[in-house]
From Swiss-Prot:
Binds 1 zinc ion per subunit. Part of the 30S ribosomal subunit. Contacts proteins S3 and S10. This is Small ribosomal subunit protein uS14. The keyword Zinc applies. InterPro entries: Ribosomal_uS14, Ribosomal_uS14_bact, Ribosomal_uS14_CS, Ribosomal_uS14_sf. Zn(2+) binds at residues 24, 27, 40, 43. One of its GO terms (cellular component) is small ribosomal subunit. It comes from Parafrankia sp. (strain EAN1pec). It comes from the Bacteria.
Amino acid sequence: MAKKALVEKAARKPKYAVRGYTRCQRCGRPRSVYRVFGLCRVCLRQMAHRGELPGVTKSSW
């Protein structure tokens, strides 16, 4: 789980636009966040396996 202070800090609008970064909406993880879903790779995988993301399927080739 992310530190609450860092989650609050990321929610504020930065002074310069390039300093802004995405965080997972579910757990607050700052790295490897898919912008389309707003989730990190860990949460995306968990929710996809449970079927909570409509239209997302496990690929196989």
